[in-house]
Curated annotation (Swiss-Prot):
Residue positions binding Fe cation: C106, H148, H152
Superkingdom, natural source: Bacteria
Keywords: Hydrolase, Iron, Metal-binding, Protein biosynthesis
Protein name: Peptide deformylase
EC number: 3.5.1.88
Gene3D superfamilies on file: Peptide deformylase
The organism of origin for this protein: Mycobacterium ulcerans (strain Agy99)
PANTHER family found in the cross-reference section: PEPTIDE DEFORMYLASE, PEPTIDE DEFORMYLASE, MITOCHONDRIAL
Active site: E149
HAMAP family: Pep_deformylase (MF_00163)
The gene coding this protein: def
Cofactor(s) listed in the protein's UniProt record: Fe(2+)
Length: 197
């Protein structure tokens, strides 16, 4: 269990759909999964993230951890893990996202954020760390996180959801940082925090 590097946009593992976590006939999960989950929590916490998908640290498995409020202004957070999540959402708006209310960032695009259109409500079903069924739903920031993390597991970054001038700004930012190529990562807690925490 340790803080590990987070892959940056351009790494193939971020752009490849993940594989389901194997579940035994008796409902058992892989014996090494608790160690991976602990590493994911520790890395997410060190990065001050609200969620972290396994492929962001190089594991092509379908699970994410989260520590997220329902609303940006609320102090109470929900924390947990979802294994093999299935996502359901309300309709995603087709209009331009609001720069004040729809801003979104990503640990794999460190220090950047862009307005991103997302459904206002989302639900995921899957398994918890013990292999028990879990269902999470929410609106606002929590719904945004559920969509963001499940998108990672499907091989997409939030940059892939951007439209118009926001998409163009993101492409310029990726190019200016020298991202978009394999092998780049950053280690939370080492050097300046790209998000200013």
């Amino acid at each position: 269990m340790a803080v590990v590097p987070i892959r940056i946009v351009g790494d193939p593992v971020l752009h490849t759909p993940t594989s389901p976590v194997p579940v035994g006939a008796d409902g058992s999960l892989p014996a090494d999964l608790p160690e991976l989950i602990a590493t994911m929590y520790e890395t997410m916490d060190a990065a001050h993230g609200v969620g972290l998908a396994a492929n962001q640290i190089g594991y092509g498995l379908r699970l994410f951890v989260y520590d997220c409020a329902d609303d940006r202004r609320k102090a109470a957070h929900r924390r947990g893990v979802v294994i093999n999540p299935v996502l359901e959402t309300s309709e995603i708006p087709e209009n331009m996202p609001d720069p004040d209310n729809d801003d979104e960032g990503c640990l794999s695009v460190p220090g950047e954020s862009f307005p991103t259109g997302r459904a206002t409500w989302a639900r995921v079903t899957g398994l918890d760390a013990e292999g028990n069924p879990v269902e999470l739903e929410g609106s606002g920031l929590f719904a945004r996180m559920l969509q963001h993390e499940t998108g990672h597991l499907d091989g997409y970054l939030y940059l892939d959801c951007l439209i118009g001038r926001h998409a163009r700004s993101a492409k310029r930012a990726v190019k200016s940082h020298g991202w978009g190529v394999p092998g780049l990562s950053w280690l939370p807690g080492e050097g300046p925090d790209p998000f200013g925490h």
